[in-house]
C-alpha cells in the first residue's frame, strides 16, 4: 500500500466511531483485525477498500455474542493417494469452458451484490451449476441458493459423501467498480470471474469422472460461490457463521480469488500464509507440486483479504492459492479495465487442476 493510501485509510478511520453500540445514521460495523472494530458509512467502506484496506463487515453479528473458536481438527494426508484418478480427471478439464464461461460472466454490466445485474449474474451462474449436475446424472448431487440480507445470493453445490466431514472449494462471484459500485462497469474478469469459473470447471471435472462416482467419496464435497465479498466478506460470513452454529465438520476450505493473471515475472502461484491454516497450506503445496506445472511461493495478503477469512474466523481450516505473489497481483481489478484481455487461460487451467486435485484427494481421504 502506498503512503498516500495509508494516509487516506487513517483519515477515514479517524471519522469512524469505534465500539459495539450502533451510532445514529446508516452505519456498518467493520473488523480490521481481531477485536479491532469501527463504525463506518457505506461510502467510507468503499473508500477504505479502494485505498487498500481490507476488513470484515460484522454488522449482522451485533447481539449474537460471537466468540472465536479453535479450528476444527483435521488429519490431512501426507502423501498423494489417487494420482491415476486425478490425472485422468485433469485430462478432461477444458480451457474452452473457462473462456466461454468467463466471457459470459464478464458481459453483465457489473455483478455488484446490491445491483440488479448482480442478481441476474447469480441466476445465470446458478443455471450453469444446475446444468453441470443434471448432465452428469450423479446421484445425490444438488445445488441450492443461500439467501443473504441483500440482493445477491450464495450458491452451493453438494456431492454427498459417506461421512459428515466436509471439504469446500469456493470463490466469490461479485464484482465492483470502486468509482461507481452500483452502476459502474465492472466486468470483474479476474476479480473474481476467474475464480468462479475455476470452481465451476472443477465441479465439471469431478462429476464428469465415472471413476470418481464409482469410488463413492468418503467426505462430502461442496462447491461455493459467495455473494458480496467486495462489501466485507458478506456472503461467506452468512455461510460459515451458519455452519458454525450448526456444528458442521468443515475439515478444509480452499479459496479461489484471482486466478487468471500471470503476473510480470516468473509464473507462479501465491500461497497465502496469513490468516490461513498452516497444516492445510502444506497439503496445498503437495497438491500443486503433484498436479500443476508451475511453482508456488509463500505470500501474505492481510487480514480479511478474501473469503477464506470467514472460514478461518468461524473455526474452519482454510487456505488460499492465488494467481501470483500478492505484490504482483492484477492492477486492473475493481475497475472497468478488469477484462479478459489481461488474463491467461493456461494459467487459469492450472488453478482448475489444483482445485480438482484438492477436492478429489481430500474427498477420498479416510479419517480426515
UniProtKB/Swiss-Prot annotation:
GO terms in the biological process aspect are: proteolysis
Q: Where does Zn(2+) 2 bind?
A: 191, 230, 334
Alphabetical keyword list = Aminopeptidase, Disulfide bond, Glycoprotein, Hydrolase, Metal-binding, Protease, Secreted, Signal, Virulence, Zinc
Entry's InterPro entries? M28_fam (IPR045175), Peptidase_M28 (IPR007484)
The top EC class is hydrolase
User: Which region is the signal sequence?
Assistant: 1-18
Give the record's cofactor note, including how many are bound: Binds 2 Zn(2+) ions per subunit.
Carries keyword Glycosyltransferase?
no
**Which SUPFAM superfamilies does the UniProt entry name for this protein?**
Zn-dependent exopeptidases
Which Gene3D superfamilies does the record associate with it?
Zn peptidases
Q: Which residues form a coiled coil?
A: none
Cellular component (GO) terms are: extracellular region
Q: Matching Pfam families, A to Z?
A: Peptidase_M28
- Report if keyword Kinase is assigned: no
- What are the required cofactors? Zn(2+)
Which positions bind Zn(2+) 1?
A: 172, 191, 257
Name the family the entry cites.
Belongs to the peptidase M28 family. M28E subfamily.
Cite the record's note on assembly: Monomer.
The identity of this protein, by name, is Probable leucine aminopeptidase ARB_03492
Specify the species: Arthroderma benhamiae (strain ATCC MYA-4681 / CBS 112371) (Trichophyton mentagrophytes)
Amino acid at each position: 500500500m502506498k503512503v498516500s493510501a495509508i494516509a487516506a485509510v487513517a483519515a477515514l478511520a479517524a471519522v469512524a466511531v469505534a465500539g459495539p453500540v450502533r451510532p445514529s445514521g446508516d452505519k456498518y460495523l467493520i473488523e480490521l483485525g481481531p477485536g479491532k472494530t469501527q463504525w463506518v458509512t457505506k461510502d467510507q467502506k468503499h473508500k477504505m477498500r479502494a485505498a487498500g484496506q481490507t476488513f470484515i463487515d460484522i454488522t449482522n453479528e451485533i447481539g449474537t455474542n460471537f466468540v472465536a473458536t479453535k479450528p476444527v481438527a483435521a488429519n490431512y494426508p501426507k502423501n498423494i493417494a489417487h494420482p491415476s484418478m486425478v490425472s485422468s480427471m485433469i485430462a478432461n478439464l477444458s480451457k474452452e469452458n473457462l473462456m466461454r464461461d468467463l466471457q459470459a460472466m464478464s458481459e453483465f454490466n457489473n455483478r455488484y451484490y446490491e445491483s440488479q445485474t448482480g442478481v441476474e449474474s447469480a441466476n445465470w451462474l446458478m443455471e450453469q451449476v444446475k446444468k453441470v449436475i443434471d448432465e452428469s446424472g450423479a446421484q445425490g448431487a444438488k445445488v441450492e441458493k443461500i439467501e443473504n440480507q441483500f440482493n445477491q445470493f450464495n450458491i452451493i453445490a453438494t456431492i454427498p459423501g459417506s461421512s459428515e466431514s466436509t471439504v469446500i472449494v469456493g470463490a466469490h462471484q461479485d464484482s465492483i467498480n470502486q468509482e461507481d459500485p452500483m452502476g459502474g462497469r465492472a466486468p470483474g474478469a479476474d476479480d473474481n470471474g476467474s475464480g468462479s469459473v475455476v470452481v465451476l470447471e472443477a465441479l465439471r471435472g469431478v462429476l464428469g469422472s465415472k471413476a470418481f462416482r464409482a469410488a463413492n467419496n468418503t467426505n462430502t464435497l461442496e462447491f461455493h460461490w459467495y455473494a458480496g465479498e467486495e462489501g466485507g466478506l458478506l456472503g461467506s460470513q452468512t455461510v460459515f457463521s451458519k455452519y458454525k452454529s450448526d456444528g458442521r465438520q468443515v475439515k478444509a476450505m480452499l479459496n479461489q480469488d484471482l486466478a487468471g493473471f500471470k503476473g510480470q515475472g516468473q509464473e507462479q502461484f501465491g500461497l497465502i500464509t496469513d490468516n490461513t491454516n498452516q497444516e492445510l497450506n502444506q497439503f496445498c503445496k503437495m497438491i500443486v507440486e503433484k498436479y500443476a506445472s508451475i511453482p508456488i511461493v509463500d505470500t501474505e495478503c492481510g487480514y480479511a483479504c478474501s473469503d477464506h477469512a470467514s472460514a478461518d474466523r468461524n473455526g474452519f481450516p482454510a487456505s488460499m492459492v492465488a494467481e501470483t505473489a500478492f505484490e504482483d497481483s492484477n492492477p486492473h481489478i475493481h475497475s472497468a479495465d478488469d477484462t479478459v484481455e489481461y488474463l491467461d487461460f493456461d494459467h487459469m487451467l492450472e488453478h482448475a487442476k489444483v482445485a480438482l486435485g484438492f477436492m478429489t484427494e481430500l474427498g477420498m481421504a479416510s479419517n480426515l
